[in-house]
Amino acid sequence: MKIGIIAAMPEELVYLTQNLDKPQEVQVLGNTYYTGSVGNTEVVLVQSGIGKVMSAMSVAVLADHFQVEAIINTGSAGALAEGIAVGDVVIAYKLAYHDVDVTAFGYAYGQMAQQPLYFESDKEFIARIKENLSQLEQTWHLGLIATGDSFIAGDDKIASIKTHFPDVLAVEMEGAAIAQAAQALGLPFLVIRAMSDNANHEASISFDEFIIEAGRRSAQVLLAFLKALD
């Protein structure tokens, strides 16, 4: 299986490129893609850029140009639920948009028109990564991740998201868009995020301090998953 891997920022990608076997750089539409393998699994890595549009574009390129058979998103996120600490990993069982509102047409808040409210990760991938995580010294959680084109850094914003999604575990800026694009193209997907901050008023300071470590932890979980696919 050839897997496309998307990270939004260089800090979220660097640990993966350092652990890529037989890496090669390929330029497509002005962006750099890294091909190679992890164990016996063929992969294509890309730094998409931040936000929903850039990440969804990368899904399309990975599918069309590189013919990947699955998509995995890795990187950092802000923790929203009690009991989730900076450094913990959250695996998205499902994802939703926290900034979409077409309720005037009868859709649920967060539901894009003509789309489901939730985008569910591939069940086989979830089962496999749970097995991997049981063997790693890494605190992890499985649940809902919310996506929007905002960096969440305040209690009022947290409260707003939780009003609509009380079971949300973490928030970030790409996952649901990647999931929607992958689902539209018939590709199984998985989203792995390590917590860089708590999305509160100190989030920007915490993010700057912990983004590299969050990227590394998320990548470590992903690498263990890929090697187990051998």
What are these regions (language model features)?
Residues 2, 67, 85, 141, ...:
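Short loop/turn motifs at secondary-structure junctions
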Residues 75, 173-185, 217-219, 226:
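Conserved catalytic block of serine-dependent lipid acyl chemistry
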Residues 200-230:
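His/Asp/Glu-rich mid-to-C-terminal helical/loop segments that flank catalytic regions of hydrolases
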Residues 44-48, 146, 192:
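Active-site-proximal beta-strand elements of phosphoester/diester hydrolases
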Residues 1-123, 127, 132:
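Metabolite-binding pocket within alpha/beta catalytic cores that recognizes anionic/polar moieties
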Residues 178-209:
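Zn-dependent metallopeptidase/amidohydrolase metal-coordination segment
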Residues 105-170, 177, 181, 185:
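Active-site rim beta-loop-alpha module in soluble metabolic enzymes
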Residues 9, 78, 95, 147-150, ...:
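Glycine-rich beta-alpha junction loops
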